[in-house]
């Protein structure tokens, strides 16, 4: 399936239906009063997060979405039917942005979440509404109020527990393929991975979701190599696994380049828990391995794990280290949620 994580679409809610002009007509009632009903309300534009989707590719082929108009009012004081809603089904993790691409209108983070983006117009009044003591046979009605319309952007930010970051050809896709059933494209040249990939990883009796994004380059925070869109896919992760290619000449420069891009991108990426790993150690001599590990540790100012996605060396240890960070993050999130709930529950009521 092709991957699309950003698109622009046009939305319009339904116009309200017109009110009716009608008069009561029954046997033995010669001059029945007005009984024209109101028009129906126009359909809403609704966005819904659904399970089983991980791309916005459907919105490449259809960019205009319009809800139906409300039904006409009818005699005997019957209101028109409500217009049919336009429901946009999107993957979990989709954000709806205003035309400026900055203002977030909706953030779809849970399966089944539904948000009304545009409300349908109200139905018009039928002539029964205008009946009065001085106007007993009105022929007035209103046509219904127009619906809302706007252009919006849909932006998908994948939801994963852990994210893989690193320069192109750092071995991220090889690692993902080694620990999950994901099958990203793998080759011995930079920029093999051009779209994000998700894999479900089994660590003991627990599972977590790992995201592999295309390799970052210098200037990614400014959009070079579509870097800003790729970085958005690791915004929601709980921990980052930073892979550094051990066969590179300068592992310190490789590490600092990615850290700089994370810091300049913002969004809290630079503050996320980070595990640093020297990858492709199967291609290094013992002397090269120790030399580069020491260099990388000096730049990262933290322990450096050793890894080879190709041979499996260090993979299991890495999975349980990732799981440990994920557990800690989940625990902190649960405590924060409990604290918020406690404050709401015991907040003083203002009279």
Curated annotation (Swiss-Prot):
EC number: 3.6.5.-
Keyword ATP-binding: no
Keywords: Cytoplasm, GTP-binding, Hydrolase, Magnesium, Metal-binding, Nucleotide-binding
Binding-site positions, Mg(2+): 173, 193
Ranges of residues in domain Obg: 1-159
List of residues binding GTP: 166-173, 191-195, 212-215, 279-282, 308-310
Cysteine-cysteine disulfides: none
Cofactor or coenzyme needed: Mg(2+)
Localization: Cytoplasm
Biological processes, Gene Ontology terms: ribosome biogenesis
GO CC, one annotated term: cytoplasm
Primary location group: cytoplasm
Domain named OBG-type G: residues: 160-327
Listed InterPro entries: G_OBG, GTP-bd, GTP-bd_Obg/CgtA, GTP1-OBG_CS, GTP1_OBG_dom, GTP1_OBG_dom_sf, OBG_GTPase, P-loop_NTPase
Pfam families: GTP1_OBG, MMR_HSR1
A molecular-function term among this protein's GO annotations: magnesium ion binding
Function in brief: An essential GTPase which binds GTP, GDP and possibly (p)ppGpp with moderate affinity, with high nucleotide exchange rates and a fairly low GTP hydrolysis rate. Plays a role in control of the cell cycle, stress response, ribosome biogenesis and in those bacteria that undergo differentiation, in morphogenesis control.
Summary of subunit composition and partner proteins: Monomer.
PANTHER family: DEVELOPMENTALLY REGULATED GTP-BINDING PROTEIN-RELATED (PTHR11702), MITOCHONDRIAL RIBOSOME-ASSOCIATED GTPASE 2 (PTHR11702:SF31)
Similarity comment text for this entry: Belongs to the TRAFAC class OBG-HflX-like GTPase superfamily. OBG GTPase family.
Name of the protein this chain belongs to: GTPase Obg
Classification lineage: Bacteria, Pseudomonadati, Pseudomonadota, Alphaproteobacteria, Rhodospirillales
Gene that encodes it: obg
